Amino acid sequence: MQIGADGLLHHLYWGAGLTDVPSFLYDRAPYRRAHMVEGQPASSPMCSREYFHYECPTFGTGDFRIAALTATAENTGLDLCDLQFVAYRISEGREELRGLPFAVGEAVETLEVLTEDPLTKLKISLFFHLFEDVDVITRHMRIENGGDCAVRISEAMSATVDFENGCFSLMSLDGTTLREFTPCIQPLRPGVTEIGSTRGASSHQHNPNIALLRADTNEVQGEVFSFSMLYSGSYTLRMEQDAYGALRVQGGIQPRGFGWRLMPAETFDTPEIALCWSDGGCNGLSGKLHAFVRNHLLRGPWAHQVRPLLLNTWEACYFDVNEERLLKVGEAAARHGVELLVLDDGWFGCRNAANSSLGDWFCNSEK
């Protein structure tokens, strides 16, 4: 990333290691002609904000693509926010994300970048947590109301990543009951594409994980970029490809149905999102994410041990459960090393089919 001449935090690159950074920065110099309908700083009339890549783009500043933050001051109704760079800090370790799930680790490095809107005094801290052992970066945003009036937040993304070359296929995991996690691959087109949930839960309709695949990517080779929400509520993973083929990707809280009133001196943290890159195809990505979950998400004594085995009665019995049958299933399972038998559906009320007795939480003694 880089601090631009406009004072904003610019996104430069994410991917394989670079060997010649100066040449890369030279090639990134803006060249597109400014248009009269686009916002650009008076000092750089050839540099339109619509074409720059940003770490935290906001609404109403000349960047007409999807925004990472929309906040409205209650006293003026102003919903424009121009986040100027203030300071940054690099530290070892990380702080807890209160009330939300987050990744942990012994060798974590954290970059915190502070920006502020000069007019509303809204302060935005962008957090980048580097898990170098698995090539994963987790990100979230903290919003602090430094002004003297309440602010209404209606849009708050955990991360934004802009790609100069947005030629990708999108892989998502979709489905429903009994056919969850069905891979779906589709090419990205100009305009907005969204995977998300408005159910109050992440849901099995659309899993809160996506991957972007290059044209030559397969199971064992090619670039893959993944975005995984560490969040079980309503979410969005959305992309916008512009007329020049550049792509913006964002992940965060689902804006539909979301609104947060932030009083002066209060803070609001967005959920964490995990970003992972691999040049070893989908299999390489899976390996990195598997290691990330095992080493940095799982908690407690079983994180690195073989877990106890259990058998759930659903697939074996469905609703047809009774004492004699359960004993036979349990005895057979025990012979194979199973340590726990879980009685699933069919034990309560007149629960003999899926259309009866939900809520009748009393034991069916006849079974």
Regions found by a protein language model. Name each.
Residues 243-263:
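Short acidic, Pro/Gly- and aromatic-enriched capping/linker segments at domain boundaries
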Residues 302-367:
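Aromatic-lined carbohydrate-binding/catalytic grooves of carbohydrate-active enzymes
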Residues 82-85, 260-279:
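Short Pro-Gly-centered flexible turn/kink motifs
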Residues 137, 152, 269, 336-337, ...:
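Short loop/turn motifs at secondary-structure junctions
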